[in-house]
Amino acid sequence: MQADLDAFLDHLRNERQVSQHTLDGYRRDLAKVHAHCEREGLDAWSALDAGRLRRLIARLHLQGHSSRSLARLLSALRGFYRYLLREGRCRHDPAAGLSPPKGERRLPRTLDADRTQQLLDGAVEDDFIARRDQAMLELFYSSGLRLSELVGLDLDRLDLAAGLVRVHGKGNKARDLPIGSKAREALRAWLSLRAQARPADGALFVGRTGRRLTPRAVQLRVRQAGVRELGQHLHPHMLRHSFASHLLESSQDLRAVQELLGHADIATTQIYTHLDFQHLAAVYDQAHPRARRRKDDTS
């Protein structure tokens, strides 16, 4: 069974050219299913049936796994079985028709526009690390990049004269994104210092040793910036969420936001309409004469 898993992961890496982040997710999810099969005494993927798979999903749900993580596991398993079916390794997909337990969909956390400006307008020293980190923060928010997209950027994907950056998202799909003027300024300042590290390749964001930054290193730098400027922990995806929410709030163009984020399904983008409604509801509560509570209203 492990040989089939390894062959599938090689297929994803070499044929589908998925990102390392996506590959690691498939590996973790499928390892859980593999361990369950071993507990059930199964020695082939063709022996896994829907009943056994339901027991696994129920057990993981009771252990606290979210509906979203279980949906991702089932999606990974369906992809794996499509591969096995094509290779003639089995004749059925036990995950077909199975759905994870329903759960509330959490709204993504965002910064409001003022807090975002406070983060990005903090004092920046003219040194290697500070300029690099500022460029990363500006680019995350300016173009709504995923963490994996920013880490994977090379110099030749950047066209500052045209104000564009080409990123490769999920499924290695390329999209060209605009870069705002503040982000362009920050990138130019960073590029003036980047050569100090003597980079070994064309990676846009590197450490002092010249090597491409890892996702973990970028997460740490964003978190430290959040604590320093805002007194709170930040994650790179929070800047992507803020980009989407602020853009939708200003433009009301859901399709454009979908294209910029690289979402295959507009339903994924629609989560930001709930954030926009929250903003409008807050404005209504503060401004509408029939919505404001009187100070002496204790009912």
From Swiss-Prot:
Segments forming domain Tyr recombinase: 106-285
Domain Core-binding (CB): 1-85
Subcellular location: Cytoplasm
GO aspect biological process, one term: chromosome segregation
InterPro entries: CB (IPR044068), DNA_brk_join_enz (IPR011010), Integrase-like_cat_sf (IPR013762), Integrase_catalytic (IPR002104), Integrase_recombinase_N (IPR010998), Integrase_SAM-like_N (IPR004107), Recomb_XerC (IPR011931), Tyrosine_recombinase_XerC/XerD (IPR023009)
SUPFAM superfamilies: DNA breaking-rejoining enzymes (SSF56349), lambda integrase-like, N-terminal domain (SSF47823)
KW DNA-binding (keyword) present: yes
Record: active site: R146, K170, H237, R240, H263, Y272 (o-(3'-phospho-dna)-tyrosine intermediate)
Major localization class: cytoplasm
GO cellular component, one term: cytoplasm
GO molecular function: DNA binding; tyrosine-based site-specific recombinase activity
Any Pfam family hit: Phage_integrase
Subunit structure: Forms a cyclic heterotetrameric complex composed of two molecules of XerC and two molecules of XerD.
Function field: Site-specific tyrosine recombinase, which acts by catalyzing the cutting and rejoining of the recombining DNA molecules. The XerC-XerD complex is essential to convert dimers of the bacterial chromosome into monomers to permit their segregation at cell division. It also contributes to the segregational stability of plasmids.
Family: Belongs to the 'phage' integrase family. XerC subfamily.
Name of the protein this chain belongs to: Tyrosine recombinase XerC
Organism listed in the record: Azotobacter vinelandii (strain DJ / ATCC BAA-1303)
Gene coding for it: xerC
